[in-house]
Amino acid sequence: VHGSRGLGDVYKRQHLVEMDIQVKQSLEGVGQNLQDHLETYVQYECKKPVTLFNEYNPIKMALTGIEWFLFKTGTAAYSNLETGGFIRSNDLVDYPNIQYHFFPSLVLDHGRTNPDRHAFQAHVGPMRPTSRGEIKLKSTNPTSAPSIRFNYMQTEHDLSEMREGIRLAREIFHQKAFDEYRGKEINPGNVDSDTELNEFIKNKGDTAYHPCGTCKMGKDNTSVVNEKLQVYGVENLRVVDASIMP
């Protein structure tokens, strides 16, 4: 995000003209090719009191914080995404195209809202989405926040992989090992058709906070940096962040 914003003076010519910025050098690829990992959460109530819901009592949270501060141990000392995996969603793909994380609680509103019950979930996300977004300037002030448009799930490829990932997560959670823990499905809930799952994905999908690609490395006319991270056509300027990923 900040990589392309930092190159505000070398956006593609049309955008610079629109923003009334004097054009000294323009690169068509600046701010284009925005990519991110989108996730959906397959969530179930847990029939046993063994989840992180036990940790949300304010007193317990304070004690957990003190334990970590003094001893670097306890619940706050490790990632609560305790396990995960990469899976091929069907026999036609030749690489693990879906990633899973298991979390022994509910994520609500990006973690800003505490859960109200014992539950667990799988984070489901396609690895190589084909949808592309863009970042544009909203102001000539270089410190102003840009306009960010991710364009998630704009291709049937991306929607299809997410649907397959959700159905596989359900299959995993319905294995015998989960029988004593698995309660009612919370999300997606009582939906299964492609149309219903598409609506769930579009309404409930969340970012995995992996934006990249807006100053991509390469040699075509949409590339922004070379293999040394040097910006094409500008001396002594490099981009050194995830935006250079093609």
What are these regions (language model features)?
Residues 1-11:
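Single conserved hydrophobic/aromatic residue that forms the stacking wall/gate
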Residues 18, 34-64, 69-70, 75:
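Rossmann-like dinucleotide-binding core of oxidoreductases
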